[in-house]
């Protein structure tokens, strides 16, 4: 008892641990505790259509697992340890281990006595079973041992096999127990599994198997449902009654859980008062009995079982219980969001081949996505999907909407696509009767995040139920009543049960039918009598046919019942339709006439005893059967001969084709006869005749071959016939043997038939062949019209969607399948016969042949790029042509830009003509590229964009189907090819490595759908070797020159240079192409020099080409120079495919001991003597030039020394004495205004010439020639020397501007004097350069400049006024105040002591009669104007001239005002300036008339009289000498007189006077001096008493001719090109201090630079930083402006040009002043003197004056003699200013006439109008001009 208790406790303990392990196993089932089978990968788990559910059962507990269990994974299950307990330690450990782990195969070991347990049966075979029908069997287990065996567990790893637990878990010795196993198949096919029994003695493997066929109740396969949480789905339960009796449903139940059953009504039949017959299913009918609702309440993966109980009603009283029907529904409830299908499968059921199924809708819903989804891509995954046809349920993209807000259920259902199965597209082999089709349809959302798939299945069968013979054919003459049994043949692949038969309504009154048995079962392939047909009433004559319906368990079949006449129709394919007339034939000739016997009845017709009249002459052949309207059913190469009389059956509605052949006997005997066609109802007789003649009709060529063609292509051949008969014949018919409509004849007119002339060759025209003429199904294997459904898919693919591979593959296979079927049937070879009939010879046969092929737009099946070196680009040109007669739409796409290229390669690989390599390029865009797309740069005239746009326009605008939605990508080549149009394609290949690569060029088109072209390319290596050495090798190509090569160096003739040949060594080098690709050497050079350099020379220096492993001899010669022992160079070879050169080093060696000797032996160059003598001549010439230059330099040095000898000694320089005599005027005699000055006539001025040598009159001729030659050389050198001075001066100026000089600190006043003096010198020098063509004025160093400036300033101060009343200072602008503060700060830093300037008193202005008084407008601050600044047009009235002070070089204009206060006079460095009042706009345009103007208007003809000042001078001006500094002549006189110079008549001829003249032209004081004034000044400077002129004097110094016109000029405001036409600058009225001069000049220079040359701003600022003087800055700027006269002409107005259109003031200088006139004694001029009137001194520095005589004179003396050769002229003094012209055309001189002020006015200012009006006409002209401007 104790041992038993111990065993029991061990057993329960083991069970306890076993249950715990099962719970753990089931808990972690979702975590893949059970690994998958080897043949199923984890990635394919979601694609498994069946949800497999395994289970482990222990006792009555059943645990389902998510994945199948493999046997090797269950060994760790706990096993009862009962044996160990029995042994109690006596058993060895090995025995316990073996008992626990040993495995027994029951099937192999059964019956051999080796099993501890025997199982009966050893293997369970369930046999044949159907889906949904369960079979239950028992397995018996017997204990073969004498000990107990514990049965632990049963493990089954299949969901289709179930097992119960053992009836007894403890098996006593020799005891027996059992368990039940159930087979419930879910899918069709064989199923098997292994069951594992875990026991205490080991594991037993037991095999179970079964076969599953289709379910008789037509239950669809259970593929399982997937649905989200909190959702439900409904599945209708439809049951088919496969029995011949009624089946009643008695019970429906489910296994519970998430499945519920909904009956058709809410309550049961009793409460609804429905009869029980509602649940009856009639025989062979289907009925929905309930609805299965699946609810996703909990997340699980389980299986729902539905049991349906039924019974069979054999009669109303007899019932037979039926087996239960089990529906197994796997269900998986998921928590994840996504898209779910509403159906588990699209089941099409049984589809007959050739028919189209009903549409199945693929619908989806979304769950917890939150936004709407768009689907536009659907495709069929794998498998044979040619029979699946899909149509979008709505216009794509199809939107799947989310559920309403706040809802947790599924969203609304959205229909994606309608799916059809087309049975006519299913291909079967002749032996195959049924084909199972299945697969998956996948819908892809935009972005690819949410995809959904649904499986589909269908069974397509072939066959029908057909009546036998004429059982259902009623002859018209048959009279009722008549009864017959109808036999049916079952040609279906399965058995058929016919349970009912019905008639069409129109047959009910005439016929009656009844089945022979309750259910007629017809086995597959058998014939059985089915029903009895009774003919009760005669049919009307109009009756043709009707239908009888057979109701079977498969479907309803239709049988046709018809009437027939039994008559036949014999059609002869000949001209004569009533007899077989062969016409003229030749002996031993063979002719054939084809005829067709048509059976137009719906019943089979039999011809009886069909035979020919004479076997010796005639033969009868059966060709085939032809359908009505079909010409392609007959093959001419297969014929059956009828040897004897035979009965021939002709099928209904068809015709049988026969050939009657005539073989003319050799003896020429004519054997005519008859052919009889006889049936049961009628007979016909046709005669057979022929005539024997000599001759024949022969076609040229004998056989017409059309070659390869295809639909949409038209081909033609010319038909010619030679007539060898003796007489002419007329062609009566030209046709084909089968009357094929694809052949037609051009040029044959039956109304005007051609005549075949005897013995001639006649052209009968062209025979045309168009394969697509009838366009039947078999032959129209090409073309996708854009308006068709398939064409819409092609058009959709133009936008390159993601499912493009599926679209193209589908379209291609649809077309290709038709062609393959045509090839398989042999119909692609067309062999027909053309029949030629004439009036005499008939049925002449001409054979024709053609072959239908698959066309190609690209003539090449593959493209092989040549070997291409790495880094190079190869382009191949291809021709793409449209070979058809219709337009073809194309789209060319490289594989690298094709979407999902890998899928396309897999789909198209079986259809490729050439195989792809292992390396298919799909990523690198440039490796295989299409160069003619808009992805690359195209030429401006490229038609590619226009062709693409035309294609888009055709689709979007001319085809409303696409609704303007097609947008073709630009990186594809898309267009419409017109018929026979050709285009050129450029394909590029750029290798990246040396591997052979391949790719595809895809030509999408609506002719063949897609045309793939394989491209091959491989990178090649480039290699060049020269003499076996690689490029850049360290081993050079050596020229080794030895002693034996240099033996000729000892040749005496060579040492004497009598031999002109040189030593040259030549060596050939072998250049070998060691690479894989040919190359061309385009250029060769040595160290960068073509062909020859450094002594090396390539003899055959021209391009050459080398193939791989080919060599070329390159000859290189070396000519040593014997300077070094070694010489090195680089040989450079340039190739067409490589930009860089291949470099090979060259080297040469020469023995060192031979260098000197061989170098001495080298030949001299032939030009050595010529060069020698040329050099000697050049040296002599240079020596002569040097001597001439020395002479010129000495001459200049003497002239400079003479000038320095007469230099002015240094004196104290006082600025206060400059304007003492400025306030008085000196009366000057005047001349009549009508006198015309002769000096105004332009006279040539002799240029300055160098001193020359003179020969004596008695000198020899040779001496005179040498002296003349020397003078000529001096003149030439002088000309060059003169221009070199300019160049050297400019270089010096540039150096001076660039170098920063350190100058010592000087007194600012002295610096200002030096600056003013330097400006005067520069101005004089500029005038000399303009006159003397570039001669320079004398230059001074700083010391000399300071001394001369002191003396000049003292003389200037001596005539200045001692006391001056300053005007009040006008208010200053912000910029002026800022400038003044800067100047004061600079002055405070530089001045040692303040300098007080005495104020200057101004006299009231005197208005000129000739010019109205105007008020000036104060301008803005002196800011430079930009180029884009608007120019102001304001009239500027004249202002009085102000005396000049040395504080500034350019003081502003002033007008007299009241004296300022003494407090204001103490301001240092301030120059008083009068600021005129601002005029009103009306006054600016129309100035008021003054009294002088009114007087002038009253006396227009009178000459102008001098104008007296408005107020008399004060007492301060009485003691002042009469000479006024406002007159240039008087100032020169005073200046020279104060210098102590002699004033006698001959003093101007002295060298001192000539040397002093360059310093006299002081432009700062308004104008040049007259000759008398200059004479007085020179006398004063020489120590002679000056001649003073007072009011009573008789000797009057008159000014030059400019004095007359300076103030009376009529051009002061009229001409735009004159200075008078210029408006006063904006800075004319601003206060200018002494220290502001530099800033004023800087502003002027900066403005000019900004206007004319922006690039000079930086240089100018740098120069200003170096504190250049204003004269230097302005001179530099003037030189730059002189070098760009075009800029001056275009921008004449710069500073102060804002008022250019106003009438200018009277500040214009007189243009008639002759500046080259020599100031001498009055005897040199003839002059008239008039009364002298004083002139006011208030003149502006700008030349503006309010008096008509600013120089103190109102008359001018005109010179009467020419002064050009005068020794005192400025020309003889070395001063040649601007050339003097006449008063009408002479240059006008102003203070702005120098280069310093070219920035302000154009050079055209100095060229006034050609005609100078008279003085009497000036006022009127001036008024006219003023009026014009005012208007």
From Swiss-Prot:
Residue spans of biased composition, Low complexity class: 1223-1234, 1394-1407, 1435-1448, 1500-1514, 1808-1820
Biased composition (Basic and acidic residues): 1455-1467
Ranges facing Lumenal side: 30-1169
Start and end residues of each stretch annotated as Disordered: 1223-1252, 1325-1516, 1663-1759, 1800-1831
Ranges facing Cytoplasmic side: 1191-1831
Lipid bilayer topology: Single-pass type I membrane protein
A GO cellular component annotation in the UniProt record: membrane
Record's signal peptide: 1-29
Bilayer-spanning residue ranges: 1170-1190
Localization, UniProt: Membrane; Endoplasmic reticulum membrane
Chain positions covered by the region annotation PapD-L domain: 118-294
Null mutant phenotype: RNAi-mediated knockdown reduces the abundance of collagen in the cuticle, retards development and increases sensitivity to high temperature, ER stress and cuticle disrupting osmotic stress.
Tissues/organs with expression: Predominantly expressed in the intestine and hypodermis.
Segments of skewed composition (Acidic residues): 1338-1349, 1822-1831
Regions of compositional bias (Polar residues) in chain numbering: 1480-1497, 1669-1687, 1702-1733, 1742-1758
Keywords in alphabetical order: Endoplasmic reticulum, Membrane, Signal, Transmembrane, Transmembrane helix
One GO process term, biological-process aspect: collagen biosynthetic process
InterPro entries: Ig_TMEM131_2, Ig_TMEM131L_4, Ig_TMEM131L_5, TMEM131-like, TMEM131-like_N
Assembly information from the UniProt record: May interact (via PapD-L domain) with collagen proteins (via C-terminus); the interaction is direct and is involved in assembly and secretion of collagen.
Family to which the UniProt record says this protein belongs: Belongs to the TMEM131 family.
Domains as described in the record: Possesses a PapD-like (PapD-L) domain similar to bacterial PapD domains involved in assembly and secretion of bacterial pilus components. The PapD-L domain can bind collagens and is essential for collagen assembly and secretion.
Biological function: Collagen binding transmembrane protein involved in collagen secretion, probably by recruiting the ER-to-Golgi transport complex TRAPPIII. Required for normal development.
PANTHER family the UniProt entry points to: RW1 PROTEIN HOMOLOG, TRANSMEMBRANE PROTEIN 131 HOMOLOG
Name the record gives this protein: Transmembrane protein 131 homolog
């Amino acid at each position: 008892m104790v041992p038993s208790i111990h065993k029991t406790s061990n057993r329960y303990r083991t069970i306890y641990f076993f249950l715990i392990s099962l719970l753990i196993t089931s808990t972690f089932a979702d975590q893949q505790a059970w690994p998958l089978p080897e043949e199923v990968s984890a990635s394919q788990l979601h694609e498994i259509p069946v949800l497999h559910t395994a289970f482990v059962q222990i006792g009555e507990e059943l645990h389902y697992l998510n994945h199948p269990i493999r046997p090797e994974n269950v060994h760790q299950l706990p096993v009862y340890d009962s044996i160990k307990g029995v042994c109690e330690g006596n058993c060895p450990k090995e025995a316990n281990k073996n008992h626990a782990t040993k495995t027994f195969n029951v099937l192999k070991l059964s019956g051999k006595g080796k099993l501890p347990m025997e199982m009966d049966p050893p293997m369970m075979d369930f046999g044949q079973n159907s889906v949904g029908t369960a079979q239950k069997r028992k397995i018996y287990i017997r204990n073969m041992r004498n000990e107990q065996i514990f049965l632990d567990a049963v493990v089954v790893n299949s969901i289709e096999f179930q097992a119960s637990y053992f009836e007894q878990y403890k098996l006593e010795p020799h005891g027996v127990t059992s368990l039940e196993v159930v087979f419930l198949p879910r899918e069709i096919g064989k199923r098997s599994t292994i069951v594992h029994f875990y026991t205490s003695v080991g594991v037993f493997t037991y095999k179970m198997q079964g076969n599953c066929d289709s379910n008789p109740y037509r239950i669809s396969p259970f593929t399982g449902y997937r649905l989200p949480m909190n959702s439900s789905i409904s599945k209708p339960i439809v049951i088919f009654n496969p029995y011949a009796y009624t089946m009643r449903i008695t019970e429906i139940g489910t296994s519970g859980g998430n499945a519920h059953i909904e009956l058709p009504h809410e309550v049961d039949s009793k409460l609804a008062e429905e009869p029980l017959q509602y649940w009856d299913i009639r025989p062979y009918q289907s009925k929905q009995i309930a609805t299965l609702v699946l609810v996703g309440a909990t997340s699980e993966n389980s299986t729902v079982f539905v049991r349906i109980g039924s019974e069979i009603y054999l009669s109303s009283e007899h019932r037979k219980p039926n087996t239960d029907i089990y529906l197994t529904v796997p269900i998986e409830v998921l928590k994840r969001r996504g898209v779910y299908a509403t159906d588990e499968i699209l089941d099409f059921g049984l589809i007959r081949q050739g028919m189209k199924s009903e549409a199945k809708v693929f619908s989806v819903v979304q769950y917890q996505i939150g936004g709407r989804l768009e689907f536009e891509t659907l495709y069929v995954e794998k498998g044979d999907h040619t029979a699946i046809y899909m149509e979008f349920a709505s216009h794509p993209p199809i939107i799947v909407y989310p559920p309403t807000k706040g809802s947790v259920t599924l969203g609304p259902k959205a229909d994606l696509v309608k799916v059809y199965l087309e049975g006519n597209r299913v291909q079967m082999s002749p032996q195959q009767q049924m084909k199972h089709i299945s697969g998956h349809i996948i819908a892809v959302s935009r972005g690819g995040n949410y995809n959904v798939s649904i499986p589909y299945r269908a069974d397509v069968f072939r066959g029908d139920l057909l009546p036998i013979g004429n059982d259902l054919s009623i002859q018209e003459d048959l009279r009722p009543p008549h009864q017959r049994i109808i036999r049916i043949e079952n040609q279906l692949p399965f058995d058929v049960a016919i349970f009912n038969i019905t008639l069409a309504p129109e047959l009910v009154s005439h016929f009656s039918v009844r089945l022979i048995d309750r259910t007629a079962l017809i086995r597959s392939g058998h014939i059985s009598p089915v029903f009895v047909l009774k003919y009760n009433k005669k049919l009307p004559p109009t009756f043709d046919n009707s239908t009888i319906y057979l109701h079977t368990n498969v479907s309803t079949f239709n049988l046709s019942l018809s009437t027939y006449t039994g008559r036949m129709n014999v059609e002869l394919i000949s001209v004569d339709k009533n007899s077989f007339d062969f016409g003229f034939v030749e002996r031993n000739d063979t002719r054939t006439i084809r005829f067709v016997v048509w059976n137009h009845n719906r019943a089979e017709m039999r011809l009886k005893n069909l035979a020919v009249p004479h076997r010796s002459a005639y033969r009868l052949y059966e060709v085939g059967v032809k359908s009505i309207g079909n010409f392609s059913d007959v093959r001419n190469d297969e014929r059956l001969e009828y040897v004897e009389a035979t009965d021939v059956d002709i099928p209904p509605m068809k015709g049988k084709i026969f050939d009657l052949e005539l073989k003319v006997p050799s003896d020429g005997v004519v054997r005519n006869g008859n052919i009889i066609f006889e049936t049961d109802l009628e007979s016909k007789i046709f005669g057979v005749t022929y005539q024997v003649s000599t001759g024949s009709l022969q076609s040229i060529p004998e056989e017409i071959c059309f070659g390869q063609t295809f639909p949409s292509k038209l081909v033609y051949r010319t038909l010619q016939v030679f007539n060898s008969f003796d007489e002419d014949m007329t062609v009566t018919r030209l046709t084909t043997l089968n009357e094929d409509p694809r052949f037609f004849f051009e040029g044959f007119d039956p109304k005007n038939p051609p005549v075949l002339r005897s013995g001639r060759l006649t052209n009968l025209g062209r025979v045309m062949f168009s394969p697509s003429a009838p366009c039947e199904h078999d032959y129209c294997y090409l073309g996708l019209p854009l308006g068709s459904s398939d064409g819409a898919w092609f058009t959709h693919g133009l936008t390159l969607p993601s499912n493009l591979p599926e679209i193209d593959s589908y379209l291609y296979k649809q077309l290709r399948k038709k062609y393959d079927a045509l090839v398989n049937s042999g119909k692609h070879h067309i062999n027909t016969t053309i029949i030629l009939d004439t009036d005499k010879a008939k049925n002449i046969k001409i054979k024709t042949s053609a072959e239908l092929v698959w066309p190609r737009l690209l003539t090449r099946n593959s493209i092989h790029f040549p070997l291409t070196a790495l880094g190079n680009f190869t382009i191949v040109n291809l021709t793409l042509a449209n070979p058809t007669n219709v337009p073809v739409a194309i789209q060319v796409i490289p594989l690298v830009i094709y979407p999902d290229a890998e899928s396309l390669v897999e789909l198209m690989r079986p259809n490729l003509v050439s195989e792809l390599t292992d390396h298919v390029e799909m990523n690198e865009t440039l490796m295989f590229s299409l160069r003619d797309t808009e992805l690359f740069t195209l030429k401006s005239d490229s038609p590619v964009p226009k062709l693409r746009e035309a294609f888009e326009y055709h689709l979007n605008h001319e085809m409303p189907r696409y609704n303007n939605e097609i947008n073709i990508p630009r990186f594809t080549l898309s267009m419409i090819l017109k018929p026979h149009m050709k285009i050129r394609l450029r394909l590029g290949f750029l290798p990246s490595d040396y591997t052979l690569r391949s790719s595809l060029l895809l030509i999408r088109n609506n002719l063949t759908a897609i045309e793939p072209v394989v491209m091959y390319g491989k990178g090649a290596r480039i290699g060049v070797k020269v003499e076996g050495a690689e490029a850049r090798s360290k081993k050079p190509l050596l020229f080794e020159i030895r002693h034996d090569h240099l033996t000729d160096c000892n040749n005496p003739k060579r040492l004497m240079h009598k031999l002109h040949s040189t030593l040259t060594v030549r060596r050939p080098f072998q250049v070998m192409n060691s690479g894989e690709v040919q190359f061309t050497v385009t250029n060769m050079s040595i160290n960068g020099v073509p062909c020859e350099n450094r002594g090396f020379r390539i003899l055959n220096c021209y391009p050459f080409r080398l193939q791989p492993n080919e060599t070329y001899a390159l000859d290189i010669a070396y000519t040593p120079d014997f300077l070094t022992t070694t010489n090195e160079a680089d040989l450079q070879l340039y190739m067409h495919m490589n930009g860089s050169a291949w470099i090979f080093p060259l080297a040469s060696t020469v023995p060192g001991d031979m260098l000197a000797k061989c170098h001495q032996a080298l030949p001299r160059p032939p030009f050595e003597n010529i060069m020698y003598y040329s050099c000697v001549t050049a040296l002599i010439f240079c020596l002569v030039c040097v001597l001439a230059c020395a002479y010129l330099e000495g001459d200049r040095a003497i002239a400079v020394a003479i000038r320095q000898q007469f230099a002015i000694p240094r004196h104290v320089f006082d600025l206060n004495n400059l304007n003492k005599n400025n306030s008085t005027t000196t009366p000057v005699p005047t001349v009549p205004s009508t006198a015309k000055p002769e000096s105004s006539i332009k006279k040539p001025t002799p240029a300055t010439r160098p001193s020359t040598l003179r020969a004596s009159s008695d000198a020899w001729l040779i001496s005179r020639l040498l002296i003349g030659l020397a003078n000529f050389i001096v003149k030439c050198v002088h000309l060059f020397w003169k221009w070199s001075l300019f160049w050297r001066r400019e270089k010096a100026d540039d150096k001076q501007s660039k170098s920063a000089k350190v100058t010592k600190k000087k007194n600012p006043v002295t610096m200002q004097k030096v600056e003013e003096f330097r400006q005067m010198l520069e101005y004089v020098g500029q005038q000399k350069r303009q006159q003397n063509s570039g001669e320079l004025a004398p230059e001074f160093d700083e010391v000399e400049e300071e001394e001369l400036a002191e003396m000049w300033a003292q003389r200037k101060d001596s005539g200045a006024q001692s006391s001056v009343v300053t005007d009040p200072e006008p208010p200053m602008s912000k910029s002026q105040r800022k400038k003044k503060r800067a100047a004061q700060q600079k002055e405070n830093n530089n001045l040692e002591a303040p300098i007080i300037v005495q104020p200057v008193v101004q006299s009231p202005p005197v208005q000129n009669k000739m010019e109205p008084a105007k008020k000036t407008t104060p301008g803005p601050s002196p800011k430079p104007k930009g180029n884009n600044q608007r120019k102001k047009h304001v009239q500027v009235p004249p202002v009085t001239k102000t005396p000049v002070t040395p504080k500034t070089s350019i003081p502003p204009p002033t007008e007299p005002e009241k004296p300022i206060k003494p407090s204001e006079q103490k301001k240092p460095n301030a120059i008083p300036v009068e600021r005129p009042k601002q005029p009103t706009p009306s006054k600016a345009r129309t100035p008021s008339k003054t009294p002088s103007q009114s007087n002038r208007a009253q006396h227009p003809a009178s000459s102008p009289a001098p104008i007296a000042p408005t107020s008399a001078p004060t007492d301060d001006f009485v003691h002042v000498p009469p000479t006024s500094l406002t007159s240039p002549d008087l100032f020169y006189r005073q200046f020279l007189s104060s210098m102590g110079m002699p004033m006698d008549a001959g003093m101007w001829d002295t060298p001192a006077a000539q040397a002093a003249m360059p310093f006299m032209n002081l432009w700062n004081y308004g104008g040049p001096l007259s000759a008398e004034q200059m004479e007085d000044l020179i006398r004063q400077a020489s120590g002679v008493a000056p001649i003073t002129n007072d009011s009573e004097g008789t000797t009057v110094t008159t000014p030059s001719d400019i004095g007359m016109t300076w103030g009376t000029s009529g051009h002061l405001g009229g001409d735009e090109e004159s200075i008078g036409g210029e408006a006063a600058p904006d800075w004319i009225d601003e206060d200018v201090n002494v220290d502001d001069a530099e800033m004023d000049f800087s502003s002027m220079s900066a403005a000019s630079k900004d206007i004319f040359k922006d690039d000079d701003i930086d240089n100018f600022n740098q120069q200003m930083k170096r504190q250049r003087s204003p004269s230097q800055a302005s001179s530099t700027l003037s030189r730059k402006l002189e070098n760009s006269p075009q800029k001056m002409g275009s921008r004449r107005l710069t500073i102060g040009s804002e008022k250019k259109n106003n009438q200018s003031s009277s500040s214009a200088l007189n243009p008639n002043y002759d500046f080259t006139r020599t100031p001498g004694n009055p005897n040199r001029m003839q002059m008239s003197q008039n009364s002298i009137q004083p002139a006011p001194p208030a003149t502006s520095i700008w030349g503006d004056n309010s008096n008509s005589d600013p120089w103190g004179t109102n008359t001018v003396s005109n010179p009467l003699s020419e002064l050009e050769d005068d020794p005192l002229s400025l020309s003889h003094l070395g001063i040649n200013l601007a050339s003097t012209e006449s008063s009408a055309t002479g240059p006008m001189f102003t203070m702005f006439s120098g280069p310093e002020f070219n920035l302000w006015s154009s050079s055209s200012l100095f060229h006034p109008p050609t005609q100078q009006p008279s003085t009497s006409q000036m006022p009127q002209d001036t008024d006219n001009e003023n009026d014009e401007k005012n208007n």
